[in-house]
Amino acid sequence: MALRGSHRLDDFIRRCSALTLFHSQAPSRRVSHCGRDRRQQQDPPGQGRQEQQESGGGHWSRFGWRSLIRFFVPFSLGAVASSLVIKREELTPTITAKAMSGRRRDFNFIADVVAGCADSVVYIEIKDTRHFDYFSGQPITASNGSGFIIEQNGLILTNAHVVINKPHTMVQVRLSDGRTFPATIEDVDQTSDLATLRIQVSNLSVMRLGKSSTLRSGEWVVALGSPLALSNTVTAGVISSTQRASQELGLRNRDINYLQTDAAITFGNSGGPLVNLDGEAIGVNSMKVTAGISFAIPIDYVKVFLERAAERRKKGAAYKTGYPVKRYMGITMLTLTPDILFELKSRSQNMPSNLTHGVLVWKVIVGSPAHSGGLQPGDIVTHINKKEIKNSSDVYDALADNSKHLDIVILRGVKQMHVTITPEDP
């Protein structure tokens, strides 16, 4: 484009050189066409008019070309610059799947799944109404998680542990387009770790629900969510097992066969969808034990929860089940069964070889008693108040005790440590 603009300018100058712009009575001075020959000579008598016609006139030949160039060169450069801006925008075009060719078109099945369902995934923030940011004056974020829209009128599905057991908090939902809305908790089932939220907005993109009963080990799946508050994050993997019983995981009072996957699921992924290659949710991301071992609640189990919740809402009552409210510590935990311990020891050299039981601290809520006391994700609880901890039920029993403080023995890597926590009363 720059060469084309320069060629047009040269052509214009050559055309102008053939015109007689005006006649001068003064003796003409010959100036070479390219401006390189500046020899000045007196014209012979009778040849002034002819030379003026050839050169374009006396005064114009002295001053006109410079003015012409000063005017048209910036004009030409401006045209070139504008053309370069257009070309720059074309450097990052939006490419649709149909426009792709070769292996990109044939094997980008993960991208096709994400394009079809990412708009229905939301980011959930739990705001602490007692603590405010110094600069903005807004409540600080105590924890976060994910969810996905299941009804166009604003019904959102997530994990119960994402939104409950946090006193003095409010729930806020951010959509994929950046809009943010306050949310109300409608239905909670702590036994299955499921909950629904409602935001006051309509015409939303909805996630289609599939069938987890048809899944096979080895199937490709995609986990969507907001790990570490990074919205719309995508990880992929396969189904490792479709029948991982809750008893194997040491989960209290639950009768669920979890989906095990090697798709990366972290704290912010909790509550987000686990999606098959048809773009259907076949599970709700629930927990991660270690790299390559994560679990999701099967969508068939979720459908039962949603049906019961819908029936209760028709009767004008929310669907809430779960454990009696106990003192609040602020952790999400997982019992270390022999199978899980074997996997952890095979993947990490920081795991004590003589460890036979305990409870893994999977998540610590910011600002909670556990956070203030020094517990960290990845810690393994072995004793509370000198009592041996073998599973998560032992931790619940310790919370039900009347002890004001909990003296907790943990393993952080291979190092044994003591932390003291003061649980909050309900």
Swiss-Prot record:
Domain of life: Eukaryota
Key words of the record: Apoptosis, Hydrolase, Membrane, Mitochondrion, Protease, Serine protease, Transit peptide, Transmembrane, Transmembrane helix, Zymogen
EC number: 3.4.21.108
Primary subcellular site in the record, as a coarse category: mitochondrion
Serine protease, as annotated region: 143-306
Compartments it resides in: Mitochondrion intermembrane space; Mitochondrion membrane
Any one Gene Ontology BP term: ectopic germ cell programmed cell death
Membrane topology term: Single-pass membrane protein
Family from the record: Belongs to the peptidase S1C family.
Quaternary structure annotation from Swiss-Prot or TrEMBL: Interacts with th/DIAP1 (via BIR 2 domain).
Protein name from the UniProt record: Serine protease HTRA2, mitochondrial
Coiled coil location: none
Keyword Hydrolase: yes
MF-aspect GO terms: serine-type endopeptidase activity
Entries under SMART domains matching the protein: PDZ
Record function comment: Serine protease that shows proteolytic activity against a non-specific substrate beta-casein. Promotes or induces cell death either by direct binding to and inhibition of BIRC proteins (also called inhibitor of apoptosis proteins, IAPs), leading to an increase in caspase activity, or by a BIRC inhibition-independent, caspase-independent and serine protease activity-dependent mechanism. Can antagonize antiapoptotic activity of th/Diap1 by directly inducing the degradation of th/Diap1.
Keyword Cell membrane attributed: no
Organism: Drosophila ananassae (Fruit fly)
Motif (IAP-binding): 79-82
Reactions listed under catalytic activity: Cleavage of non-polar aliphatic amino-acids at the P1 position, with a preference for Val, Ile and Met. At the P2 and P3 positions, Arg is selected most strongly with a secondary preference for other hydrophilic residues
Regions that span the bilayer: 68-86
Propeptide: 31-78
